[in-house]
Curated annotation (Swiss-Prot):
It catalyses: (8S)-3',8-cyclo-7,8-dihydroguanosine 5'-triphosphate = cyclic pyranopterin phosphate + diphosphate. Gene3D superfamilies: Molybdopterin cofactor biosynthesis C (MoaC) domain. GO terms for biological process: Mo-molybdopterin cofactor biosynthetic process. This is Probable cyclic pyranopterin monophosphate synthase. Substrate binds at M75, C76, H77, M111, E112. Pathway: Cofactor biosynthesis; molybdopterin biosynthesis. It comes from Methanosarcina mazei (strain ATCC BAA-159 / DSM 3647 / Goe1 / Go1 / JCM 11833 / OCM 88) (Methanosarcina frisia). Its EC number is 4.6.1.17. One of its GO terms (molecular function) is cyclic pyranopterin monophosphate synthase activity. Belongs to the MoaC family. The active site is at D126. The lineage of its organism: Archaea, Methanobacteriati, Methanobacteriota, Stenosarchaea group, Methanomicrobia.
Length: 157
């Protein structure tokens, strides 16, 4: 059976009508990572990044992005967000971010979780870009990767 796109009807984009769906608990967790130099990772680890606390700033950015997802993803519904958790981990070559979003609503929150992760990682980049630039101002080794949905739950979140 061929899958069809729910947001496209007769070749035009549209917002899916969810009015007949029941409100249920929903949860989505998304993750991603940003590859950084060993020197930059050490600055984050020791709290010596010139712009300030990288994770505190990126956490706020993730929360704001989750709440504003319908403003940047055209077919996303405005839904009540009941909880957001943002976690970071410093690895050997990268910082990992995980964003968990919860709601009681008619549609899932995976786009909100993905948007939160993306914004968190972009904010990490912004906070450390002066340390990551090469001599001509480029970022030859900085890389955001592996942004994905880890988990999506409906009815038992």
């Amino acid at each position: 059976m061929e899958k069809s796109f729910t947001h496209i009807e007769a070749g035009r984009a549209r917002m899916v009508d969810i009015s007949e769906k029941n409100d249920v608990s929903r949860l989505a967790r998304a993750a991603g990572e940003i590859v950084l130099s060993a020197e930059t990772l050490e600055k984050i680890r020791t709290g010596t990044v010139e712009k300030g606390n990288v994770f505190a700033t990126a956490r706020v950015a993730a929360v704001l992005a989750v709440k504003k997802t319908p403003e940047t993803i055209p077919m996303c519904h405005q839904i009540p967000i009941t909880g957001i958790d943002v976690d970071f981990e410093i690895g050997e070559e990268a910082v990992s971010a995980v964003v968990e979003v919860r709601t009681v609503g008619k549609t899932g929150v995976e786009m909100e979780a993905l948007t939160g992760v993306s914004s968190a990682l972009l904010t990490v980049w912004d906070m450390v870009k002066s340390a990551e630039k090469d001599e001509i101002g480029n970022y030859p080794h900085t890389l955001i990767r592996n942004i994905r949905v880890l988990e999506k739950l409906k009815g038992k979140a």
